[in-house]
């Protein structure tokens, strides 16, 4: 049997960012509108600093207005909420993203609830979650949106396909299931209490792994020819024992990739699969929010 097609999320995301950049230039020339994204970072978490740096660079490369607010680790919740209120009222800012995790003195739920739903480019606000659940226009969480784009690029029409989403988080699992339902797939959401999870997975034409457990989904769980989207990003010890003993790590997904690629029809690698799509879809949401703020229809050719 031939090996699975490797779904190149990095290349797809680069193409999407290029098309977003062209749409931004059109907004600038036709409407004098420049989409603006504000990212808020509290503290000095190294991973968060890298994420914020990458987001800022890609926002500027797309021709958007980019603002980063770096706050000290001892920032109070009241101070952060005050900043969010200012960003909500700023007409040059169309998207607001607060980088998680936050320090323990700050309640992330209260912070996310304070963001104007029309500027909630992460798509985490309960208003946007509700809009997605009932099929109304809103801002969709970036990672599930990116997964849907990759799926439609590989499969085309998802109508009638059996999709299994392993994981039920508010960030990936639940919104992913809603997007698949809207695409007319038949959807099962599996989780830690699912009985005979391997058998459930084997029934999937489309398998989305979003559990945060390294290589939990084995090759024997996958139906021959299935499309596998691996959302997991997990750090595990390096393969080389000496490197592992020195604290070196490697990144793996939630799927045992080497096993799965001999069975699946197509699969996303980790890294280089879903990850690059997340920031690209953040830019897409910022563009969408900017268009809606002025009553402009977002470009249809950018949406899945």
Swiss-Prot record:
One of its GO terms (biological process) is tetrahydrofolate interconversion. Signal peptide: none annotated. Gene3D superfamilies: Leucine Dehydrogenase, chain A, domain 1 (3.40.50.10860), NAD(P)-binding Rossmann-like Domain (3.40.50.720). Pathway: One-carbon metabolism; tetrahydrofolate interconversion. PROSITE patterns: THF_DHG_CYH_1, THF_DHG_CYH_2. Its EC number is 1.5.1.5, 3.5.4.9. One of its GO terms (molecular function) is methylenetetrahydrofolate dehydrogenase (NADP+) activity. Keywords: Amino-acid biosynthesis, Histidine biosynthesis, Hydrolase, Methionine biosynthesis, Multifunctional enzyme, NADP, One-carbon metabolism, Oxidoreductase, Purine biosynthesis. It catalyses: (6R)-5,10-methylene-5,6,7,8-tetrahydrofolate + NADP(+) = (6R)-5,10-methenyltetrahydrofolate + NADPH; (6R)-5,10-methenyltetrahydrofolate + H2O = (6R)-10-formyltetrahydrofolate + H(+). Coiled coil: none annotated. InterPro entries: Aminoacid_DH-like_N_sf (IPR046346), NAD(P)-bd_dom_sf (IPR036291), THF_DH/CycHdrlase (IPR000672), THF_DH/CycHdrlase_cat_dom (IPR020630), THF_DH/CycHdrlase_CS (IPR020867), THF_DH/CycHdrlase_NAD-bd_dom (IPR020631). GO terms for cellular component: cytosol. NADP(+) binds at residues 167-169, 192, 233. Catalyzes the oxidation of 5,10-methylenetetrahydrofolate to 5,10-methenyltetrahydrofolate and then the hydrolysis of 5,10-methenyltetrahydrofolate to 10-formyltetrahydrofolate. Belongs to the tetrahydrofolate dehydrogenase/cyclohydrolase family. NCBIfam families: PRK14186.1 (NF010783), PRK14188.1 (NF010785). Homodimer. HAMAP family: THF_DHG_CYH. This is Bifunctional protein FolD. The gene is folD.
